[in-house]
Design a protein with these regions (language model features):
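ABC ATPase nucleotide-binding domains
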Residues: 35, 76-230
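The feature captures the beta-strand-to-loop junction immediately N-terminal to the Walker
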Residues: 39-41
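ABC ATPase nucleotide-binding domain helices that frame the ATP-binding cleft
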Residues: 47-50, 146
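Helix-to-loop junction immediately C-terminal to a conserved catalytic motif
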Residues: 54
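Conserved ABC transporter NBD signature motif
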Residues: 62-70
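Non-catalytic connector elements of ABC transporters
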Residues: 250-294
């Protein structure tokens, strides 16, 4: 079996703020071609880690290695990374072509090569023919696709995405997730993604890092995180969960795993809520003093 190549390694990395907040004892290996998502509530430290990888924040302690080489002393523009933020950061007075070409021109890439690379990249993100348009003529999803394309044109070793779809509506977010998966698969690039949206993390990721209060609660595949949560925080943060306290322990049961025993015949219950969720309906019913969701 071929050994996987480590693309990014965080070694006992820490970033502390003056007020004591931040992250510490961060250790993680990310392998080539993976999409790894940092998932957690606001303020848990996920964006802090991403910004230290990109060089937009200095580490307090520890090391960050890309392809085995330390990058902690390199400024952002010298790092083999490209970062896409929630805001698109496209220049409104430039055409899409000019926005895409800007970084390549700074690197003194010949115009003929720039034209060929932009043509190929626009085909990859399904936006051929948009070269002469301006950002204001594009939808939010299209602008984010161009922002991602601009980053990919620089051929980074790591693509860093800081909640890039959070400003988009639900349907466009889903389309963008599918588009990102396709692009990542076609290019084989390593992606570090940050989100507070559990559905987004589950849909996109090869592995998920669930964070809480500046630390890792669990690192695993979406299936491992969902089926075998390591802590109560992970269990409550991922999917729906019923918690049943039993003495000094807590039993966690997902609603879809509950089976009603019909052995005692029909039971009367009061329907408390009905939620239509596309192809299925969630009912909350009250039976005596027991609440059951199914």
């Amino acid at each position: 079996m071929e050994e996987r190549k480590v693309k990014l390694e965080l070694k006992d990395m820490a970033k502390k703020y003056d007020n004591g907040d931040g992250v510490e004892h961060i250790n993680l290996k990310v392998y080539e071609g993976e999409i790894v998502t940092f998932l957690g509530p606001s303020g848990c430290g996920k964006s802090t880690i991403l910004r230290t990888i990109g060089g937009f924040m200095d580490v307090t302690d520890g090391d960050i290695l890309v392809d085995g080489q330390s990058i902690v002393n390199l400024p952002p523009e010298k790092r083999p990374t490209a970062m896409v933020f929630q805001s698109y950061n496209l220049w409104p007075h430039m055409t899409i072509y000019e926005n895409l070409a800007f970084g390549l021109k700074l690197r003194k890439v010949p115009k003929k090569e720039i034209d060929a690379e932009i043509k190929k990249m626009l085909e990859l993100v399904s936006m051929s023919g948009f070269e002469k348009k301006y950002p204001g003529q594009l939808s939010g999803g299209q602008q984010q696709q161009i922002a991602i394309a601009r980053s990919l044109l620089l051929k980074p070793s790591l693509l860093l995405l800081d909640e890039p779809f959070s400003a988009l509506d639900a349907k466009i977010r889903q389309q963008m997730r599918e588009e990102l998966k396709k692009i990542q698969s076609d290019l084989g690039i390593t992606v570090i993604f940050v989100t507070h949206d559990q559905e987004e993390a589950m849909a996109l990721s090869h592995r998920i890092v669930v964070m809480n209060k500046g630390k890792f609660d669990q690192v695993g595949t979406p299936g491992e995180i969902y089926d075998s949560p390591a802590t109560l925080h992970v269990a409550s943060f991922i999917g729906e969960m019923n918690f049943i306290r039993n003495g000094g322990s807590t039993i966690a049961v997902r609603p879809e795993d509950i089976v009603v025993n019909k052995g005692h015949g029909p039971m009367e219950a009061v329907v408390r809520t009905i939620m239509m969720l596309g192809h299925y309906v969630v009912l909350t019913v009250q039976l005596s003093l027991i609440h059951i969701s199914e």
